[in-house]
């Protein structure tokens, strides 16, 4: 899977969290680790890159400030 695959996993992790404020990076990491074969440093690297790309493109947003929880913004 490419970066779009990781972005879809991040979006699925946020949706699975079922809270209005989104999901923490730790919760997203746990979800991706449980639902993919990525582990350790590779998982952390790909997750950081996917979060950064999603925030930059507007596909993801921080509900409060520039750190913490991440959510998929409403269109």
Curated annotation (Swiss-Prot):
PROSITE patterns: H15. Keywords: Chromosome, Developmental protein, Differentiation, DNA condensation, DNA-binding, Nucleosome core, Nucleus, Spermatogenesis. Residues 2-74 form the H15 domain. One of its GO terms (molecular function) is DNA binding. InterPro entries: Histone_H1/H5_H15 (IPR005818), WH-like_DNA-bd_sf (IPR036388), WH_DNA-bd_sf (IPR036390). One of its GO terms (cellular component) is nucleus. Its main location: nucleus. This is Sperm-specific protein PL-I.
């Amino acid at each position: 899977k490419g970066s779009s695959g990781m972005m879809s996993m991040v979006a699925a992790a946020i949706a699975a969290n079922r809270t209005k404020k989104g999901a923490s990076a730790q919760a997203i990491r746990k979800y991706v680790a449980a639902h993919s074969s990525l582990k350790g440093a590779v998982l952390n690297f790909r997750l950081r890159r996917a979060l950064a790309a999603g925030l930059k493109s507007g596909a993801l947003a921080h509900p409060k400030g520039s750190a913490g929880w991440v959510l998929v913004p409403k269109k």
